């Protein structure tokens, strides 16, 4: 079993999945992972399916050099976006794997949220391409490692209603406290 970069806060209410040396572009997969971070599991699966069908785009924020603009990126507050099919399919498989792990653990699958997703560079694979005048250039690929951790969403705790017998005291600055003391001394 491999080591994950982050341990979940509540291991009993979370599940994990990972993939190593996946033959999919690192940069596109990084942007895909950042797009689905903190999403509920059901929404993330639906979103990645929509990306493969070009109904929703992946916003490109960090690795966006030369990336064209698309209207679908407006909903994410950016202008550049793409539909990286392979980079959407690999995390989708990992999410399904994590979902089956959660089902095996007896977690409520409908309440799962992507708590942690991380994409790291894997060692580059080297091939060659033949150029004019007998030269050879490298033809590299950039695979990646992906790890996902899902956790059950906690129920939001409502704030207690303020009681009338003890009004909340407002914190005063040092300057105002000094003025109040001065005023009390004069009286």
From Swiss-Prot:
<dbReference type="GO" id="GO:0022625">
    <property type="term" value="C:cytosolic large ribosomal subunit"/>
</dbReference>
<dbReference type="InterPro" id="IPR001063">
    <property type="entry name" value="Ribosomal_uL22"/>
</dbReference>
<dbReference type="InterPro" id="IPR005721">
    <property type="entry name" value="Ribosomal_uL22_euk/arc"/>
</dbReference>
<feature type="region of interest" description="Disordered">
    <location>
        <begin position="155"/>
        <end position="187"/>
    </location>
</feature>
<keyword id="KW-0687">Ribonucleoprotein</keyword>
<keyword id="KW-0689">Ribosomal protein</keyword>
<dbReference type="GO" id="GO:0003735">
    <property type="term" value="F:structural constituent of ribosome"/>
</dbReference>
<protein>
    <recommendedName>
        <fullName>Large ribosomal subunit protein uL22</fullName>
    </recommendedName>
</protein>
<dbReference type="Pfam" id="PF00237">
    <property type="entry name" value="Ribosomal_L22"/>
</dbReference>
<dbReference type="InterPro" id="IPR018260">
    <property type="entry name" value="Ribosomal_uL22_CS"/>
</dbReference>
<dbReference type="InterPro" id="IPR036394">
    <property type="entry name" value="Ribosomal_uL22_sf"/>
</dbReference>
<dbReference type="GO" id="GO:0002181">
    <property type="term" value="P:cytoplasmic translation"/>
</dbReference>
<comment type="similarity">
    <text>Belongs to the universal ribosomal protein uL22 family.</text>
</comment>
<feature type="compositionally biased region" description="Basic residues">
    <location>
        <begin position="169"/>
        <end position="178"/>
    </location>
</feature>
